[in-house]
Design a protein with these regions (language model features):
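ATP-dependent phospho-/nucleotidyl transfer catalytic cores
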Residues: 124, 131-202, 267-270, 274, ...
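Regulatory N- and C-terminal appendages and interdomain linkers associated
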Residues: 1-42, 46-48, 223-225, 294-330
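Short linear loop/turn motifs
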Residues: 121-126, 167, 283-292
Length: 330
């Protein structure tokens, strides 16, 4: 059996010791919730605790907290977010929880991207859900929160001012400029941002829009990027989706893009340098994504995706890596 958090092999169903500590402070929490999924349970139980929708408005998020060693739904002092199987017209939606869990684990375990503790959990009716610990809640016993803003708020773009597609109006270059403007330690944070944008491209997260990047204020008074969130291979659910939610550059495409019709090594090299990252550092970060096929395959195989979706996930990643290593020559 594999741990429902990190995929480590264990002798029982549930979470390994490390994941119990990271997720629940060491409390022995069961990986099966004591109630059915929202589709089989009293809708009022869930409706009062819904947070918001994602995956283009088809996935509900619910607030949870730890009561002793049990996870319970709550409408206040939430410590966790629960995302059950979405409903809608997208493909393979029953695989969405496992997809997000795997993609978040890949980011955290293999690509040096900070992610909050997360896991797969199950309802009593065996339906899976994605569980993630909130990173904005302080561990001070008072359930206070770190001040946080997403980059739509920072850029002051809203549906009222920019229309329904406001989340997709900026470019990644413009988010980088906002990081420079609002975060004093921007040199460090820009490298984190660059790594995350590259990860989203390679693992086909086509919904990494401006609201899926945020900054927060630490106890020390420093502004930093939050841990990454909402990472998943959206192409599994929306095959015709664009490679990226936003363009790399503000108002142009590179010569490499014009020649190839898609982003490649040259685009990300140029993008990193446009952000102000030294070329040697950009090259180093890009190179860290190479040669990890065996490690990626191991996590995909250990994940809770359906077997045929595992094959698709690997195929999509390999295709994107093939594109990524195309070098443009003038």
């Amino acid at each position: 059996m594999n741990c429902s958090g990190c995929f480590k092999e264990i002798d029982y169903a549930g979470y390994c010791r490390k994941c119990l500590k990271d997720l629940f402070g060491g409390k022995k929490v069961e990986h099966v919730l004591p109630y059915n999924s929202p589709y089989k349970e009293d809708s009022n139980l869930y409706q009062e605790r819904i947070l918001k929708l994602s995956i283009s408005g088809v996935q509900a998020k619910y607030s949870m907290r730890l009561d002793g060693s049990k996870l319970i739904l709550t409408d206040r002092d939430g410590q966790y977010i629960l995302k059950p199987i979405p409903v809608g017209q997208f493909k393979n939606l029953d695989q969405a929880p496992a997809n997000e869990h795997l993609t978040m684990q890949l980011a955290g375990q293999l690509f040096k991207i900070t992610v909050p503790p997360n896991a797969i959990t199950y309802f009593s009716d065996h339906s899976p859900a994605y569980l993630v610990k909130r990173f904005d809640v302080k561990s001070d016993g008072q359930e206070s929160k770190y001040p946080q803003e997403d980059f739509a708020q920072i850029a002051q773009v809203t549906e009222e001012t920019h229309g329904k597609n406001y989340k997709y109006d900026l470019s990644y270059e413009e988010i980088g400029l906002l990081i420079k403007r609002h975060i004093p330690t921007y040199a460090i944070e820009l490298e984190k941002f660059f790594r995350l944008v590259l990860f989203n491209y390679i693992f086909l997260n086509g919904d990494a829009h401006v609201k899926n990047f945020s900054a927060m204020l630490t106890d020390e008074g420093d502004h930093i990027l939050t841990p990454a969130y909402d990472l998943l291979c959206t192409r599994i659910h929306s095959p015709g989706e664009a490679d990226m939610a936003l363009t790399l550059f503000k108002d142009r495409f590179s010569e490499a893009f014009d020649a190839n019709g898609f982003y490649t090594y040259n685009d990300f090299l140029e993008f990193g340098m446009v952000l102000g990252i030294k070329e040697t550092r950009v090259v180093k970060i890009i190179e860290e994504f190479n040669g990890k096929e065996a490690s990626i395959d191991k996590l995909v195989d250990a994940s809770f995706l359906r077997s045929d979706i595992k094959v698709i996930y690997k195929s999509m990643y390999r295709d994107k890596m093939t594109r990524m290593w195309i070098r443009y020559k003038k």
